[in-house]
């Protein structure tokens, strides 16, 4: 169960045939969920309608992408690099605040044990990443299509390996050196 609503959600790896569904989640998430933080010109520069599926496909190539699936629908996705950079994390309108993003994020932590994670978070995503242990490294003002946006460079220190006290030997080593 996610949040207070029961759901049968599965996580799976993205395939080329999923790009159109991802484009819908990306675009609608920005236009619907981002409306409280970004004006129409910002949302249109960030995610034009109709979605540019070819451009998104190009951005996804070279990234690891996991999908949250409910029934036959993509309700969220996360894309990341093996370096620890989280490029995309979006949930579909109607699926927000149900734990979908947290489930996807935890899959990345499991996939990248011992890797520091970092991202450029929107105003909408910043609280999510703060709740998951990230800190703001820098506030950034960036331009997309001539339109200015505020975002946050954020980082989380090395993710502990799942299991009993995986980082203890490292702590002992640091104490001996100090």
Language model regions located:
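A short helix-loop-beta-strand connector motif used in the catalytic cores of GNAT acetyltransferases and
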Residues: 50-67, 85
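Conserved acetyl-CoA-binding loop-helix of GNAT-fold acetyltransferases
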Residues: 97-110, 131
